[in-house]
Amino acid sequence: MRKLLLLIAASLLGVGLYAQSAKIKLDAPTTRTTCTNNSFKQFDASFSFNEVELTKVETKGGTFASVSIPGAFPTGEVGSPEVPAVRKLIAVPVGATPVVRVKSFTEQVYSLNQYGSEKLMPHQPSMSKSDDPEKVPFVYNAAAYARKGFVGQELTQVEMLGTMRGVRIAALTINPVQYDVVANQLKVRNNIEIEVSFQGADEVATQRLYDASFSPYFETAYKQLFNRDVYTDHGDLYNTPVRMLVVAGAKFKEALKPWLTWKAQKGFYLDVHYTDEAEVGTTNASIKAFIHKKYNDGLAASAAPVFLALVGDTDVISGEKGKKTKKVTDLYYSAVDGDYFPEMYTFRMSASSPEELTNIIDKVLMYEKATMPDKSYLEKALLIAGADSYWNPKIGQQTIKYAVQYYYNQDHGYTDVYSYPKAPYTGCYSHLNTGVGFANYTAHGSETSWADPSLTATQVKALTNKDKYFLAIGNCCVTAQFDYPQPCFGEVMTRVKEKGAYAYIGSSPNSYWGEDYYWSVGANAVFGVQPTFEGTSMGSYDATFLEDSYNTVNSIMWAGNLAATHAGNIGNITHIGAHYYWEAYHVLGDGSVMPYRAMPKTNTYTLPASLPQNQASYSIQASAGSYVAISKDGVLYGTGVANASGVATVNMTKQITENGNYDVVITRSNYLPVIKQIQAGEPSPYQPVSNLTATTQGQKVTLKWDAPSAKKAEASREVKRIGDGLFVTIEPANDVRANEAKVVLAADNVWGDNTGYQFLLDADHNTFGSVIPATGPLFTGTASSNLYSANFEYLIPANADPVVTTQNIIVTGQGEVVIPGGVYDYCITNPEPASGKMWIAGDGGNQPARYDDFTFEAGKKYTFTMRRAGMGDGTDMEVEDDSPASYTYTVYRDGTKIQEGLTATTFEEDGVAAGNHEYCVEVKYTAGVSPKVCKDVTVEGSNEFAPVQNLTGSAVGQKVTLKWDAPNGTPNPNPNPNPGTTTLSESFENGIPASWKTIDADGDGHGWKPGNAPGIAGYNSNGCVYSESFGLGGIGVLTPDNYLITPALDLPNGGKLTFWVCAQDANYASEHYAVYASSTGNDASNFTNALLEETITAKGVRSPEAIRGRIQGTWRQKTVDLPAGTKYVAFRHFQSTDMFYIDLDEVEIKANGKRADFTETFESSTHGEAPAEWTTIDADGDGQDWLCLSSGQLDWLTAHGGTNVVASFSWNGMALNPDNYLISKDVTGATKVKYYYAVNDGFPGDHYAVMISKTGTNAGDFTVVFEETPNGINKGGARFGLSTEANGAKPQSVWIERTVDLPAGTKYVAFRHYNCSDLNYILLDDIQFTMGGSPTPTDYTYTVYRDGTKIKEGLTETTFEEDGVATGNHEYCVEVKYTAGVSPKVCVNVTINPTQFNPVKNLKAQPDGGDVVLKWEAPSGKRGELLNEDFEGDAIPTGWTALDADGDGNNWDITLNEFTRGERHVLSPLRASNVAISYSSLLQGQEYLPLTPNNFLITPKVEGAKKITYKVGSPGLPQWSHDHYALCISKSGTAAADFEVIFEETMTYTQGGANLTREKDLPAGTKYVAFRHYNCTDVLGIMIDDVVITGEGEGPSYTYTVYRDGTKIQEGLTETTYRDAGMSAQSHEYCVEVKYAAGVSPKVCVDYIPDGVADVTAQKPYTLTVVGKTITVTCQGEAMIYDMNGRRLAAGRNTVVYTAQGGYYAVMVVVDGKSYVEKLAIK
């Protein structure tokens, strides 16, 4: 109905509380309710109360007292004295009658007169929100107030209420208080012990009914039952799929399809029916009968629907008139058992047309799939307690404050909570447009509006919250009355297109003040007092934030209705009743949606790479409690729920029988959905990683995983033909012993004549050159029968014999032999019967078919595959690691490979862009790769960090040079307002570090301790620290005062502390703690002022007395600003008792990067001298400059603060024309400057300016940002200088304050005194700089990537060079790394010409006396390319010379591949891009002028050159194809006269244009090569491209450069040895590179380790232990572990652990610059 806005004084209503109260202490230490010994037969319960509170109230009937007990509710007959009672909802087994036996209690009488209390007030009926308070009578039963003696209910009462989703519900009421109204006395029965037995209970039927009806989606409701623990041991808990019955109007069939498809993908088994089906029908009776039958049939089959979706308005599904409300209700479609408790979650997607239904569905799909472009709106909420002069201060405000205090706050992830507990409400609904995830209004309403503040249906239609859809709850009258003649408020809210809500919870009839209050916060004792979590039952707010529950829109409504049921009374009409509220409240929209609570979490999951066919189930890893579904094309195949270990067994109701892509959807309350596709097919034989996890910290992503199982993935033998005559074998790889190798010979009828191969191995390796000839066949004709057995210990096949016609050969297939690892001679033979020869296979493959002294390494498999090679044959050898670790890991982000070759089971990537990313890890084996295992990661924030600008890249030879401009073109673009560096980060994974301090201030022997999972799990980790207020193992109650103190910190500018905290038990959560900072010491007395102090509250499930530690509380992140100078931080656990543990984890402290603001007072400067630490410039050169003045020296001077100022004069005994600069020190990062100035009031016009410089301190570096000419009295009179006295007059003006904003990039500030003369002075004092971001260039650094791999970080310069880059195209990228994140990468492509710069070979380092001698072999004998030029730049390449010998101004140039010169069309057939060209005619206007070119194009120096190849071309038309050129060489210089012709030609036309490749030998001594264009005129031009010059090795065409520990120590060497004098005693890394004329080779490096060191008599500054094969080095420095080949195996600081194989190792430790080396033998 339409509501009136009532503004009525409280005195006009029945009662009005005011703050006069008293508390009566009872005979119990605490108020507590417990349920124990719970079973299907009985349970025990105890109730104790520690106080009764009396509050004086004024009513229309007089003054009374209200009595309350925490956790109890007001009861009584209307008009009779009101007393509190405790009410619990209990589960009753099938067939049982609950019987209560009181075992014991205490009883005490209290005289209220002693407390000055009035009579207890009469109990009043509930008030509808539609009632006019003026007309509500105050009910007073005079007879009840004349009755003598104690009056009250029986101590215990039980009432059966009905059956709710398979559980019979009863109300257990405890009435602890009786009242003698005449004597004004209370009788309180306390410490009540009872036993509730279930007589006639049928346990089997109870369990059967529960099993048949159970769904995890009803846990929210089950958790409100007092004795719920009897149902927790449910074996099939995670095998129950979600089922939904859908009944829809026939007109919605098409519009409903996308929603049905999604629900099936999500894992809902759908049973969909329409009203045009005969069994459904169109009447209310037929639809209800159909639904009831469906539910009962489903219950009988243990497949009862969880949800009932009604689709359409009342024209297709009418609903019916409520028995209690007399308004339309859908309750009885789902209340199947004949009572008022529903069996299904019911919601109505009310739409009058398919278009309106589509509007609802579109919003639901975006919300559930989380595809909204900006999810940040989910972190915002709107809470409104509407206007009502009486009830708003008694109920409305308390409701909203409860929500904010416990849930809608920063601790729960909300960034903005728009709370309006009372007027004014200005602009409150504007937040719906900007975006909120939740909106709640409680007060008055009408069928089409929230009343005050008013939001009408028309205004809802004008909302603009596109893509920001929310859940709305209206605790008010009639806003969900869906049979109203026009769409009701809730219908409009859900039906509007691209705006409004995806679901609305509201009441169809009038709602009631008290019941709506209970509905929201839970049933509680008294109005007008702020409710507490502990003093209320579970309400809808509490249920919304239950952890690990399937919280849906429907379950929120159920929780509210159960709270109203909880508060209901027995045997009286005090309240409107629970039945009314179950009829009243409805969900419009999709009630099966699980609302997000602020920003949803990211699910941790692992998907199989494929789904094998015909399996009954699949295992999928996901966060515990996740619901996992597999479907295809909208058809659901199977579902499962992830158990506590995070494994979901997806049971398939429809098996996969076809290949294709199948949808996998993972959902969980308050988690982002996972929506993926998996290919169905045969499983991969290659095992993937397991237990992949992904965590984020800022923009850093960390992946961790477990290695594949020890049994290697190549588990079955497989033979694959991969080409004609090419055969590959894959087989198990871990089937040899540690000292063995496997040799495999494979072939596929290579010659097509069934002649195959044999493999002969000589373990003595002494047959090569004799039995095995270096060339030619093994033998011809007949060989000795014992040739093989006498010389070859191992054969493939095992029965191979020396007969050319033998069948004991490998023709097609493979053979193998296992041999001891070691050195062998071998050969692979091939018989040729026609010639009688036993050939040794040719060398056409990648491995010789005969070998002298080949090493077969233990633990490896060698596969020799025979193949045709032209007219001959050959072998390709593939080597596999035969150990279980013969694989590496490859990491992908968003489908792109970002790292490969990993051997560790962890990976970190910093600077990841904000947003959602998919990371995948695959295992790369020798013979194949595993399926990818993937994880979704959400990186918070936005890419707001400025990138570099104007990045360029160039290459000369193999050297790449990058150049760029700083971000935003400024030296300090850091967008982070509070940058800093991490000073401390501790996760307590290895306990409490020794550098931390603990203080047990209460001395009970129980301080902070380390804890580990599973008992005490850390935040996203195993470890944390904890402190106890209750000890297990008989310790009992503790009163802790425990300090946990960080190591010493250096925070001159303060910092920011973040940490995670939680209660170890959510049911004993009230742990009190504080955070302190000390700038002095780390004793308890040094910590005085708390920066943060709070008591943890449970915010999770509540339960009766339980085993402590059973339900860990919710981890909450806290942030604390630390003051400047903080040296220590302390976490103090105190003022707590009888709870359990407080847990602490992930402590991180970041130092503020911001420089402290500072003020220059000039007090440290000297009178008459330039100010200290400032720079002055006397730009006018008159010898008068800025200087310090002291009021102690000049009596006319008054400083602004202190005694000193600075001054500049325009008159100082004489007229001056000043141009004086006063320049600050470096103030990079300053954003403002505030200062004070004064002038002579008599001569006030001294002009000055404030100037800034972004570069240096020269006068020309500064620009004006502010200037002024001061005003004054202009009264003339005395002027004053350094040598004058005031004589009593002080004409100095007052001090004037100015503040000037400084532009970004300001480095220096100057005060310039100029543009004035013959006045007097300007004074400055107290100059204050306000600093912004971090002031130094280390605000950010640059990171350089090549081809996706990070190659350099920490750069501060805007240039980078890399030498020795491999040939080919490369992508270079530069990103800016800020303290708070990284910028997007800016990239450029750079091409390195394919010139081969061969490195040295076989570098070795050996000691010789006190020296280190390096030896190496020269690069490969083929010198390789000395020059390779493709002219792809836009100018003549660097190093080349273009010589215009004829002097006409026309020379060689670079042109594109196709161009037009008038009518002379030129087409370059040489390449697809640029060429070098010289012209023989010149276009001027419309005519060509002839040229007579004599142009030289000269290469860089190419000493040692032997051969040149190039491409030469002429235009594509015959009449202009006769240009002449010559190839010339010089053995001296680059003048034209230095060159001699070695080849020349006149071009001739060929079809399509000339495209000629020339290859010419170059004479010995060639230094330069030139292309000379001459002896032609008036043709067009000559084009040259792709010039390659190679050398053979003579001549000094390269030199060697030697590096020690990264530093160049010698260059220009031509010998292949180098002696490093005096360096043999310490370990070093030596590298040698080859420097060619056009570039350098890659470095080749070796680690030198001395044989030993002198005995050290002093104690070694490290410890070295070997346990088994694990080497552990601990030191206060660096440690490195090497093998005897000098390869570094492990390195690190402080502690290095390495698991070795058998053999010898060297350990080097460097402490304080001194090296120590030890050798180890590992058996």
From Swiss-Prot:
- MF-aspect GO terms: calcium ion binding; cysteine-type endopeptidase activity
Q: Which residues form the propeptide?
A: 25-228
Q: What is known about temperature dependence? A: Only retains 40% of activity after incubation at 60 degrees Celsius for 10 minutes.
Q: Give binding positions for Ca(2+) 3.
A: S987, E989, S1021, G1023, D1145, E1146
Q: Where is this site: Cleavage?
A: R228, D229, R737, A738, R1155, A1156, K1290, P1291
Q: Give the function comment from the record.
A: Cysteine proteinase with a strong preference for substrates with Lys in the P1 position. Hydrolyzes bovine hemoglobin, bovine serum albumin, casein, human placental type I collagen and human IgA and IgG. Disrupts the functions of polymorphonuclear leukocytes. May act as a virulence factor in the development of peridontal disease. Involved in the coaggregation of P.gingivalis with other oral bacteria.
Q: Which family does it belong to?
A: Belongs to the peptidase C25 family.
Q: What protein name does the entry list? A: Lys-gingipain
Record organism? Porphyromonas gingivalis (strain ATCC 33277 / DSM 20709 / CIP 103683 / JCM 12257 / NCTC 11834 / 2561)
